[in-house]
Structure formats: structure tokens, C-alpha cells
Amino acid sequence: MAGVAQNGHQEMDFCMKVDPLNWEMAADSLKGSHLDEVKKMVAEFRKPVVKLGGETLTVAQVAAIAAKDNVKTVKVELSEGARAGVKASSDWVMDSMGKGTDSYGVTTGFGATSHRRTKNGGALQKELIRFLNAGVFGNGTESCHTLPQSGTRAAMLVRINTLLQGYSGIRFEILEAITKLLNHNVTPCLPLRGTITASGDLVPLSYIAGLLTGRPNSKAVGPNGETLNAEEAFRVAGVNGGFFELQPKEGLALVNGTAVGSGLASMVLFDANVLAVFSEVLSAIFAEVMNGKPEFTDHLTHKLKHHPGQIEAAAIMEHILDGSSYVKAAQKLHETDPLQKPKQDRYALRTSPQWLGPQIEVIRSATKMIEREINSVNDNPLIDVSRNKALHGGNFQGTPIGVSMDNARLALASIGKLMFGQFSELVNDYYNNGLPSNLTAGRNPSLDYGFKGSEIAMASYCSELQFLANPVTNHVQSAEQHNQDVNSLDLISARKTAEAVDILKLMSSTYLVALCQAIDLRHLEENLRNAVKNTVSQVAKRTLTMGTNGELHPSRFCEKDLLRVVDREYVFAYADDACSANYPLMQKLRQVLVDHALQNGENEKNANSSIFQKILAFEDELKAVLPKEVESARAALESGNPAIANRIKECRSYPLYRFVRGELGAELLTGEKVRSPGEECDKVFTAMCNGQIIDSLLECLKEWNGAPLPIC
């Protein structure tokens, strides 16, 4: 700040020699980790007061005011320090009008008809609001053609913030009235469509102005969802003194800005940033349940690629996997039996940091662009009191919003594509390293198809998300008698990005439920394998150790190889009928005995030392006891008394599992139960939409110091 002019307007030193083009400021805003930024956003979202001064509004604060659950707890306060500047610009307009100064929108017509002139400034503003009330609502205050109340609240907040900077020629009292509407949860009804954001969001913002001026067609929604006319809205909000008679320039100040698009964009980007972190953690959990090889997160790999988003994504996944009980078990398996799975994991796992990194960078960049926009002055003309002039320009052009929303939507679609790729591997027993097909957890796979329907739903979600990735901003139509021949379409793009966020939430919630299912299946797998191993060992000792006369039998040496078969064989390949001759367990156990018999040489000719003679006894004994032991192990787990505890409790990803299973009560799904996958996914989706899942997500990363593990 350089000082204060005589008329009270703050005089900005915009021609500073340091960073005159704002590139340094833009770069500085990206310092630090994305995760720290998300944590800061969450903290700001939860603060009880949003203080507006015109220059420090954040997307998190906009999202907080917009959120339905926050309307009674988060309030807006205006900076009293801004009053003088706002008054100075308003006074300047009235003075210039009195002096006969010719100013756009004050003494002239609008747009392509700005050649017209009038001295009746108040009537001109009244007509501006009337002809811009061109929206169509259909029936009801929340019809499909009405902007959601959250979007309207966001727009109101952003518009107040812009006008507080004192370049727009509007009275402070009008800003106070809009603030009262926000704080008393009285929301004007705005049309969903009808803006191209070339001269600002003219049509929707005119309905806020219509309510303030008491237009008979204006409507609002009250604190309890009731429909209010303008008079009732003022009474409920405690706005005294009657409706506003707009002075010259005030109508233009209210409508000629980008607040609707940038407000919705702020809401969208708050969610998008959280979803980006969520996708990183889900990718790490995917690596855990797939017995993945953690070297894909090694810092050297990503440091050599240079991209910060990729480096951070890898470091976050590395942190989750570091010390993971699943990773330790998988590493032991890979060391002792390196041929049991491919040398490298598939791309959806192995290249997830490379895939997610650019999307995080795009979302972060879009967030900064929108934060600059919501703190900008974006109407026309701008009142420069210090130089005693009105500047005619084009800050109402919402291109930063349209472009950032197109980019963010493409990033969200890419995140969804990765999620679908991971989900498809997870439910496919050809790829998932021993998990059952469709993640079925029931006793009879012929009557349990697990997540088959969910995979179909995921394909649907992903297809729609990929369609939404198509850009909006290349569909510009010349408008308003070719005066607005280029326009940003920012609200359309923001709306489509809001749809994309909603679909990615559907995908994320479905995927998380599937990952929790996989975690429980790994737990079941471990307990069943333990039961089978113990049973095979005991049966081998009883039937293979001694001969008929009590002598040691050559078949006693088979036990180690029999147990190796149990270790190597996928449990769910035989779990529904462990002793079936058609399943690989019994086939391979028999093959071990046959191989030992073939190596037994001349001893096979002696009935007392023949291993072949022992095969039938071993199999009969095993068939008699193994099914009972398998069922007993399953029943013990279902009753909460498993022989082996769930590994997830020893992992940094545990908070998300605990949230789903504990707080939400979403259970392991089987065909034996009535509950459907959609019911459980709905619980997670609702929690995600309400922000309930954020704390558990961040708890997974609470120990991360913001840096990758050292290269050693």
C-alpha cells in the first residue's frame, strides 16, 4: 500500500519495480507441498468466521460459506477498513454524473448499444436489471433450472469481496445487505443457465440485484427451505430501510462480474484438491492389497523425472507403504518365491505417481488461478479515484475460470481413469494375485458375484467422466449483436466440472469399499491358509510318519513339500471345497506324494515302505478333517476371534479402513447377506459429500514430514 488519497480511497502502488508482472507472486503461491496446502484448506474451511477485505479470500472460505452444513455456524464479516474506499468510488460516480461526465453504463447504453445516452442514471440501472432478468426457472426453487443454493451463496460471497476493493462505484450499505442475506441463510434464486461470462455473469447476478431492488419476480429460499418474496427475504435477513433504489453504476457493479463462475469453481476445487490426495492414498492401499512391489515409489526414479507433482505423489505412496505389514509380507514372498508373480507390477499400480502427478499440478494451478480471480476486480468500468477517471476495459472476461475449469475437469477424468484401471485389476482374479473373482467373500462362489455390478457401475461412471473431460471453452458463440464476440463460458465449464467431481466421488467411494473388501479377503485368506497348513501338517504327521509296524516311513519327508504347496497355492482357488479333486490343492498335494514315490526307487516294491500306499490314507484323513477346519477358521473370523489378526491395523492406511468399517458400519459383502454393494457405497459417498472422510484421510498421512525417504 502506498498510502491513502484525500478522498479516502486506498492508493495502490501497482507499478512496483519488484515483480511488476505478478509471475513471482504466482510462483511463490506454489511453494510447499500440495498436502500441506490441502491441510491448510481444510483448516480454513472449518473456521467460524470469514473476514472479507477484498484481497485474501480463499477457495476454502468460499466452499465453507457455500456448504449447506455450515450455514448456521460460519459467518461473514466485512472489513470496516474497506468502507472508505467503497464510499469514495461511489461518491466519485455521483460527482462525475453531476458534472456531466460521460461514463459507460452510467450515462450510456450497454454493450453494442452504448452509443445511446441518458441523464437518468437511476432509471438506466433499473432497466439494466429488468432486461437481464432473462433466466428460465421452471417450477420450484430447486428445480433443475435453478442454480443450487450453495452456488448462489458462493457467488454472493465472491461478489462482495470484489466490490469491497472500492473500484466499482457501489454503496457499502448494499454489500452489508448481501452479507446479512448470507448470514441469515436467505438465498436468492438464480437461473442455472443463461450466462456466457463475457461481460460477467450478467443474467444470474441480475437476480441478486432484483432481490435487493424488490423486483416482483424475485424469489429467495429461506432458512427452512421456504420460498420468500423480496419483502419477506429482507425481513428474515434483518435488512432494514426498504429496497434499494440503485444509483448510477450500482446495477452494473452488481452484475458485471465473474462471481457465479468463480464461486462455483472455488467449491469444485476445494473438493478436487481433497480428491487428488485421496487418489494418492487409494493407490497406495491398492499396492498393499495387490501384494505390490514398493520400489515403484523409490525417490530416485521420480527425482530423475523432475516433476514436483509426481515426486510428491510417489513420496506420499512411499510413506503409506513404508513399514506396511502387507508390504513386509509381500517382500518376504517375493524373496522366497520370485516366480509367483510378474517381475513388474502393471501400469495402473507401477506408474500411478507418474499418472497422478501432472493431474495434481493442474488442479493446484487451477486453484491458484481461481484464488487470484476471486480476489480480483472484474467489472467495467473501473473507478480510479486517485487519477480521477473511469477505466473502460474487460476484466469481466472470465477466461481464467473457463480455462482452469476445463483443465481441472480433464485432470479429474484422468484420476478417474486410473481409479477404474486399478478397480478392474482388483476384481479380476487373473490379475489380483490370489483374491477371488469379483472379490466374492461368500462360501459358495456360484451364488456370490461380489462386485460384478459395481464394476459395471464403475465403467459407467468412468465413461461419463471421460465424456465430461471434453472442453467447454472451444464452443464459444458470438453474442450480444457481436459485441461479445469472444466469451469465456466459465459457468458452463464450472458446472461440468462440478458434475465431474460428483462422479469422481462416486468412483472413489465405490473403490474404497472394494479396497476394504480386499483387505478383509486378505485377512480371510491368511486365516484359511493357516488352518489348511496346520491341518495338512497334522494329517501328514499322523499318516505319513510311521509304517504299519511302527517304523519310520520314507513318506515322512514329504511334509515340507506339502506345506510349500499350501503356501504357494491361492487360497480362494479351493476355499469353497478344499478337498475337491477338481481344485488345485488336492491335485498338487497328491503330486508331491507321487513325486516322492517315484524317487523312492526300490522301496516302492515293499508294501511297508511304499509311499504310493500312503496316498489314499493321507487323502482320506485330510478329507475327513480339512473341510471342518476351514469352516471353523472362517467362522472364528466372522465372530471376531480369528487366529491371525488383520494386518491392516499395522498399516498407515488403517484410518480409512476403520472409518468405513467402524464409523460408517459398512460391512464385508457376501452373497449370504441381504445387503447390496450399492448400500455400502452409498454410506461412503454420503460421508465423502459431507466432508466426514477428510479427517481419516489426513490421519493416514499425519506422520509424513513432507519429504521422500532418503536414497540409500
Curated annotation (Swiss-Prot):
Q: Which SUPFAM superfamilies match?
A: L-aspartase-like
Q: What does the entry's PTM section describe?
A: Contains an active site 4-methylidene-imidazol-5-one (MIO), which is formed autocatalytically by cyclization and dehydration of residues Ala-Ser-Gly.
Cellular component terms, GO, for this chain's entry?
A: cytoplasm
- For the keyword Cytoplasm, the answer is yes
Annotated catalytic residues: 104
**What residues bind (E)-cinnamate, as annotated?**
256, 344, 350, 380, 452, 480, 483
Which top EC class applies here?
Answer: lyase
User: Which pathway is recorded for this entry?
Assistant: Phenylpropanoid metabolism; trans-cinnamate biosynthesis; trans-cinnamate from L-phenylalanine: step 1/1
Modified residue annotations for 2,3-didehydroalanine (Ser): 199
Q: What is its EC number?
A: 4.3.1.24
Gene Ontology biological-process entries: cinnamic acid biosynthetic process; L-phenylalanine catabolic process
Keywords for the protein's UniProt record, in alphabetical order: Cytoplasm, Lyase, Phenylalanine catabolism, Phenylpropanoid metabolism
Transmembrane regions: none
A GO molecular function annotation here is: ammonia-lyase activity
Q: Where in the cell is it found?
A: Cytoplasm
5-imidazolinone (Ala-Gly), cross-linked positions: 198-200
* Protein family (similarity comment): Belongs to the PAL/histidase family.
Purpose: This is a key enzyme of plant metabolism catalyzing the first reaction in the biosynthesis from L-phenylalanine of a wide variety of natural products based on the phenylpropane skeleton.
Q: What is said about its interaction partners and assembly?
A: Homotetramer.
Which PANTHER family does the record associate with it? Answer: HISTIDINE AMMONIA-LYASE
Give the protein's recorded name: Phenylalanine ammonia-lyase
Protein species of origin: Nicotiana tabacum (Common tobacco)
